Swiss-Prot record:
Role: Involved in the modulation of the specificity of the ClpAP-mediated ATP-dependent protein degradation.
Family matches, as InterPro entries: ClpS (IPR022935), ClpS_core (IPR003769), Ribosomal_bL12_C/ClpS-like (IPR014719)
Stored SUPFAM superfamilies: ClpS-like (SSF54736)
Subunit structure: Binds to the N-terminal domain of the chaperone ClpA.
Ranges of Basic and acidic residues composition bias in the record: 1-13
Natural source organism: Xanthomonas campestris pv. campestris (strain ATCC 33913 / DSM 3586 / NCPPB 528 / LMG 568 / P 25)
Any one of the GO BP annotations: protein catabolic process
Family per similarity comment: Belongs to the ClpS family.
A Pfam family it matches: ClpS
Region (Disordered): 1-21
Stated name of the protein: ATP-dependent Clp protease adapter protein ClpS
Amino acid sequence: MPRKTSHEHDHGLVVETSKPEVAPPPRYQVLLLNDDYTPMDFVVTVLQQFFNLELERATQVMLHVHTRGRGVCGVYSREVAESKVAQVNEFSRMNQHPLLCTMEQA
């Protein structure tokens, strides 16, 4: 006598499968913090080099940081944001500037 598989016992049974709802990963804002020592042109260079901003947009962000105390450079996944923060802070120290970059959940 042939063995029956579990599928053969389930005649007429319909199983609905659904994909689990997966929330998108959280996004993080990368911020520059104003200080009284870092030259404005250095901040613009950082924005262009690390955040791929055009000169006009980099200048706008730099002025926002200068007048408001901090400004958003971009919004990224956690890993990318952490990497950008580390790169900017290291670049600032290597160039002997106190410019600080940080991140917070968007």
